Amino acid sequence: MTLKDIVVGFGTTVRSIWLIGMNAFAKRETLMYPEEPVYLPPRYRGRIVLTRDPDGQERCVACNLCAVACPVGCISLQKAETADGRWYPEFFRINFSRCIFCGLCEEACPTTAIQLTPDFELGEFKRQDLVYEKENLLISGPGKYPEYNFYRMAGMAIDGKDKGDAENEAKPIDVKGLLP
């Protein structure tokens, strides 16, 4: 060991002590998470929820577009139909242990039934607890779009109304009557 090695070792030790002393009283960058809230950007994509119409019925029409758009295949559902012809999912299942929270399911949904919330705390001890069924995903409100009702906008016959009686819907045209 030479004198040069001793001087370099002593210098690095003094420099390390100096840097620790300078930063010991600086503002801390680490957040104490449960006590301090985490900043989430306005468009943060978190847990998926299923919303309802302003009438209180499920918005999901089981079109299966969300399952097709999902790049990891974590959404599965089965379509069923009511007596009045309205489609609904018999079961709707999302496996959050596979979900990458990309938001493609929300973009693909024509009825705005699927919406992403800023909730990100999905820690569980068992993987089975990360598989959410329709009952776990349904919320009582309309979510981000409180006035949107797919069946009124789409022109499907609503109980008690004929086609063309809904809002923003033109009366049907008799195409056969236009023939010469």
Curated annotation (Swiss-Prot):
An annotated GO BP: aerobic respiration
Membrane topology: Peripheral membrane protein
Cofactor(s) in the UniProt record: [4Fe-4S] cluster
EC number(s) reported in the record: 7.1.1.-
One Pfam family of this chain: Fer4_7
Catalytic EC class: translocase
Residues noted as binding [4Fe-4S] cluster 1 in the record, renumbered to the chain: 60, 63, 66, 109
Subcellular location field: Cell inner membrane
Gene Ontology molecular function: 4 iron, 4 sulfur cluster binding; iron ion binding; NADH:ubiquinone reductase (non-electrogenic) activity; quinone binding
Amino-acid positions noted as binding [4Fe-4S] cluster 2 in the UniProt annotation, renumbered to this chain: 70, 99, 102, 105
Predominant location: membrane
Gene Ontology cellular component terms for the protein in this record: plasma membrane
Keywords from the UniProt entry: 4Fe-4S, Cell inner membrane, Cell membrane, Iron, Iron-sulfur, Membrane, Metal-binding, NAD, Quinone, Repeat, Translocase, Ubiquinone
Entry note: cofactor: Binds 2 [4Fe-4S] clusters per subunit.
Residues of the 4Fe-4S ferredoxin-type domain: 48-80, 90-119
Cross-referenced InterPro entries: 4Fe4S_Fe-S-bd, 4Fe4S_Fe_S_CS, NADH_quinone_OxRdtase_chainI
Catalytic activity as recorded in UniProt: a quinone + NADH + 5 H(+)(in) = a quinol + NAD(+) + 4 H(+)(out)
UniProt cross-references to PROSITE patterns, sorted A to Z: 4FE4S_FER_1, 4FE4S_FER_2
Matching PANTHER family: NADH DEHYDROGENASE [UBIQUINONE] IRON-SULFUR PROTEIN 8, MITOCHONDRIAL, NADH DEHYDROGENASE UBIQUINONE IRON-SULFUR PROTEIN 8, MITOCHONDRIAL
Family: Belongs to the complex I 23 kDa subunit family.
Subunit structure: NDH-1 is composed of 13 different subunits. Subunits NuoA, H, J, K, L, M, N constitute the membrane sector of the complex.
Protein name: NADH-quinone oxidoreductase subunit I
